[in-house]
Amino acid sequence: MLAEDNPGELWIEQGKTLFHQKRGPKSASLEQCNFGLGPGKLDGATTQLPRYFPDTDRVQDLESRLVTCMVQLQGFNHDDLVKRAISPAGSNGSDVEALALYITSRSNGMKMNVSLSHPKEQEMYKVGEYLFFRRSGQTDFACVQCHGAADKRIRLQDLIHMTSKQGVQEVVSTWPAYRGAHFVVRTMQWRLSDCFWQMRLPELKYASETSIALTTYLHYQGNGAVVKVPGFKR
């Protein structure tokens, strides 16, 4: 069951409208987009993402797959979509953010079940694991330094212990989430990008292989978590 009074629920309805609406230069909806279970089949689809897609010959997470469909089916420009995917704080949010929340909400109550059956999925997982533990950048920092033990915090913010099963499951099951400080829905791509910024690393390119690798590692580690979006974050 969703938490009461979560403003993020408004974005679910917005995303649903956008999904079924004919838009873009090709005046098409996203009803033929295949997120892994077949064209237009959304229930349970995000529980298995990231996954390998033969048509792109890539491992893709929800957001990169969504951009692929918006380009191929609707005719939107890839670079424009990527540029606008993460909305400014205090705005009404982006189409991609609303769509990502709606599609994920169709898996609410279902368990994460990410597979590593394809060699490219296995490779992506290994890269993500390496990145999670690798110290880098001007501060010589790694994800695990914030999220590798219990009872850590930055200022007043508790940090989730993501090398524990319970901790990583809490993360992967609650994004996209409504971010109270921004008054808008945020996605996993935003969460990773913001972490990179806080670690003073080079900007994380939206839907890049790096971001998908980290998501693959985290989502596989979180298998068994029950999806419950939108989450609510400070």
Residue ranges of each PLM-predicted region?
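Short, charged low-complexity linear segments at domain edges
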Residues: 1-16, 109-129
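Electron-transfer interface patches adjacent to heme c in soluble/periplasmic c-type cytochromes
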Residues: 1-9, 21-32, 39-98, 108-109, ...
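Hydrophobic, well-structured mid-protein blocks that either form specific transmembrane helices
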Residues: 99-103, 115-116
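Extended cationic-aromatic binding surfaces that line active-site or macromolecule-binding grooves
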Residues: 15, 19, 36-37
